Amino acid sequence: MYATVPVDVENLMYESGSTSTLKDGSYLITTSKTAFLFGGRMGSSKKVPVTLIYSDDKGVNWTSCELDNIYNAEDYYVDFFDENNGVIVCGYARTDNEKESYRIYQTANGGETWTTVGSGPANYILKGVMYVDENVGFFCYNYAEGMDGNLYMTKDGGKTFSKVTLPEQELDSTAKSSTASSTVADDELKWNDVYKEALVPTVDDKGIITVYLTQGSDGTYNDGKTAAKYQSSDKGDTWVFVRQLEITQNNNKHN
């Protein structure tokens, strides 16, 4: 059974190059809450602010709420953790030098009203966002060479952030610098020289958070095919290295 969402389709956020696939993160469909973010751009005839439309009865009735007068949005993320508490992230004002601004909103009344709580930890382009609950969330940015990590964590809903540090491990003896002599100890690659680009964390129904640390686009260790898998069972307070494994970065699939 399908339900009609009372939104002009031109105001929805689509994946790049698509006219039918909604942008990942811009909508939520569960048994208890259905929500779509739209607007934040110039429509064909008028400005449409960043707006959330949601239903608590599987599409029978809909409520809309305008969040912000932003008209150059590029990224959306919406999630609800129970019937009352939810979060929205809006990325906007992207520049040619691959910078972007962010606003983080929270609701405690099911989506009726929203409060701006923060602007994110950095202005890089987002790879993705994942919240565990109304307090704990992760911002993962596209990696650029020279970055000291691309994964950040908040414990207060988005007011403040800290960089996620994953425990280093030992590499085997084949991990040598491509420009250095294999006889010089200082020329051996270290763990964080190889595994440096985090993918967006995931969380399972038991609350276990998983992060894959990849080699980025220029990886050469194990032909660039392996990633390091880490997990946390305490909402990101501590992390345990699981193993190295082959992974496809684009879809987080592993072998």
State what each model feature region is.
Residues 33-37, 84-88, 135-138, 206-211:
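Entry beta-strands of beta-propeller and related beta-repeat scaffolds
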Residues 41, 92-94, 143, 215-217:
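Residue-level signature of beta-propeller blades and closely related beta-rich strand-turn architectures
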Residues 167-177, 184-193:
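Conserved blade-ending motifs and adjacent loop-strand segments that build the rim/top face
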